[in-house]
């Protein structure tokens, strides 16, 4: 069997889908990308952060140089609290030194354009293809689109985001063939407790390119990333009055965006900069509910879902796109081993492919679960959700030295890369050294933060009594 005899149908032409297309192209596996939008890189006001583990994979694919031309590398982080206390850390530079790649922040539209421009077979990237149904024909899959087209292949990959049609179809087929295999508890596990207003503004005096700012406030936080030519990418993450299930989450309009933002125009971002300085200079902005969840069941037979369709996180840790890129690398590695390097004379059977995908899911979920839990903690820490989190954010973290950078380094170092392409020569020593730091980091976290919280708890208990 030749690799080109195996065909992958990729649903979704965003970061994960286009990265997977490039990866499959490198190993000679056939594919088609079906994107429901009319254009591959629309301007929606969104931005994207690329951390070293995502950047390393993009570098393997020959893309990171184009990313670097579009960014102002982050080197400094400022943190502000509502009592006026501010502190500065060199964590972005520390991570750059450890891993050889800068923290990059750019327009999502630009990132998508870079990914599309790199495609050598653009005829395989099809827009205006909204998927309506997927059918399992035992040893092949057929995808149906709204315009009446059909596409048949050996594997369907859902890279179609948090509102994934592929996930819905996977659950439908699983219930039809093996009732109860995906529990209702899992299906309803995604929740919404925060909204996110995100935008891009013209340069603001006082916000310096390469210096990110996190402004902690009660029940909300601001994240700002001044980039190339001073343009500022920003997020306002605001806690809702109650937690909603995914199916009952509120939907927002542009009018809602203004209503939310006008409440906080006088909030200080950093120094003398107020949120109104960003709002009055905005070029584009939008609002969305922030879904949070990490599903356990990523695959069924010849369908697998990746990226936001399986794990959705708040943007505070910047892990969303990077985890999706990692998913792609791990899946491409699996397909390379299964289809390309083995001397087999026929395609993998449904049973063989299903077993491989179950192993893929188990490995990815083991890693994603930890990152997802960290993301949940950080968004609540920055929104000062509880008294203990307020105390930890205000008093422990500013005095914890490089511990936050060490924790981030451990997460980065544990990432997968494409094993069929060379590791970039610019990789730093952190990829190896921080893979061996798990026990040491656990000591710092348990031996540092937990006792501090216990002491605070005892003090608060005495005050109450």
From Swiss-Prot:
SUPFAM superfamilies: FAD/NAD(P)-binding domain. The lineage of its organism: Eukaryota, Fungi, Dikarya, Ascomycota, Pezizomycotina. Disulfide bonds: none annotated. It comes from the Eukaryota. Its cofactor is FAD. Keywords: FAD, Flavoprotein, Membrane, Monooxygenase, Oxidoreductase, Transmembrane, Transmembrane helix. One of its GO terms (molecular function) is monooxygenase activity. Coiled coil: none annotated. InterPro entries: FAD-bd, FAD/NAD-bd_sf, FAD_mOase_fung. It comes from Penicillium canescens. FAD-dependent monooxygenase; part of the gene cluster that mediates the biosynthesis of 15-deoxyoxalicine B. The first step of the pathway is the synthesis of nicotinyl-CoA from nicotinic acid by the nicotinic acid-CoA ligase olcI. Nicotinyl-CoA is then a substrate of polyketide synthase olcA to produce 4-hydroxy-6-(3-pyridinyl)-2H-pyran-2-one (HPPO) which is further prenylated by the polyprenyl transferase olcH to yield geranylgeranyl-HPPO. Geranylgeranyl pyrophosphate is provided by the cluster-specific geranylgeranyl pyrophosphate synthase olcC. It is found in: Membrane. The 15-deoxyoxalicine B cluster is a rare cluster that contains its own geranylgeranyl pyrophosphate synthase (olcC), in contrast to other related clusters which rely on a FPP/GGPP synthase localized outside of the cluster. It is a single-pass membrane protein. The chain crosses the membrane at residues 9-29. The gene is olcE. Pfam families: FAD_binding_3. FAD binds at residues 35, 49, 108, 308, 321. This is FAD-dependent monooxygenase olcE. GO terms for biological process: terpenoid biosynthetic process.
């Amino acid at each position: 069997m030749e690799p080109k005899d195996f065909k992958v149908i990729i649903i979704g032409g965003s970061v994960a889908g286009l990265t997977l297309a490039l990866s499959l192209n490198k190993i000679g596996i056939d594919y088609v990308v079906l994107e429901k939008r009319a254009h591959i890189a629309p301007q929606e006001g969104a931005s994207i952060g690329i951390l070293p583990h995502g950047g390393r994979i993009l570098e393997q694919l020959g893309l990171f140089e184009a990313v670097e031309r579009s960014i102002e590398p982050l080197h400094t982080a400022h943190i502000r609290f509502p009592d006026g206390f501010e502190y500065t850390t060199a964590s972005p530079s520390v991570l750059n030194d450890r891993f050889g790649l800068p923290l990059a922040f750019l327009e999502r539209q630009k990132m998508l354009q870079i990914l599309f421009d790199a495609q050598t077979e653009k005829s395989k990237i099809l827009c205006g293809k909204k998927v309506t149904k997927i059918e399992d024909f035992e040893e092949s899959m057929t995808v149906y689109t709204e315009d009446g087209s059909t596409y048949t292949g050996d594997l369907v990959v859902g890279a179609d985001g948090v509102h994934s049609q592929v996930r819905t179809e996977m659950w439908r087929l699983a219930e039809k063939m093996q009732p109860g295999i995906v529990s209702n508890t899992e299906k309803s596990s995604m929740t919404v407790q925060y909204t996110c207003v995100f935008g891009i503004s013209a340069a603001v005096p006082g916000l310096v390119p390469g210096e990110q700012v996190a402004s902690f406030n009660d029940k909300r936080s601001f994240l700002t990333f001044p980039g190339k030519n001073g343009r500022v990418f920003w997020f306002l993450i605001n806690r809702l009055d109650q937690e909603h299930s995914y199916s009952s989450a509120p939907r927002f309009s542009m009018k809602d965006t203004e209503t939310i933002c006008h409440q906080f125009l006088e909030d200080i971002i950093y120094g003398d900069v107020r949120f109104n300085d960003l709002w009055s200079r905005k070029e584009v902005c939008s609002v969305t509910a922030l879904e949070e969840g990490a599903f356990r069941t990523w695959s069924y037979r010849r369908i697998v879902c990746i990226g936001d369709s399986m794990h959705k996180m708040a943007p505070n840790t910047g892990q969303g796109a990077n985890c999706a890129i990692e998913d792609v690398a791990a899946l491409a590695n699996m397909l390379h081993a299964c289809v390309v390097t083995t001397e087999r004379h026929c395609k993998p059977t449904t049973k063989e492919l299903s077993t491989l995908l179950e192993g893929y899911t188990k490995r990815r979920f083991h890693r994603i679960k930890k990152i997802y839990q960290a993301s949940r903690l950080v968004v609540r820490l920055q929104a000062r959700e509880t008294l203990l989190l307020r105390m930890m954010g205000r008093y422990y973290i500013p005095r914890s030295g490089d511990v936050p950078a060490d924790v981030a380094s451990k997460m980065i170092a544990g990432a997968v890369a494409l094993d069929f392409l060379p590791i970039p020569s610019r990789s730093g020593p952190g990829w190896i050294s921080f893979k061996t730091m798990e026990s040491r980091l656990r000591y710092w976290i348990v031996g540092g933060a937990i006792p501090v919280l216990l002491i605070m708890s005892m003090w608060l208990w005495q005050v109450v009594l």
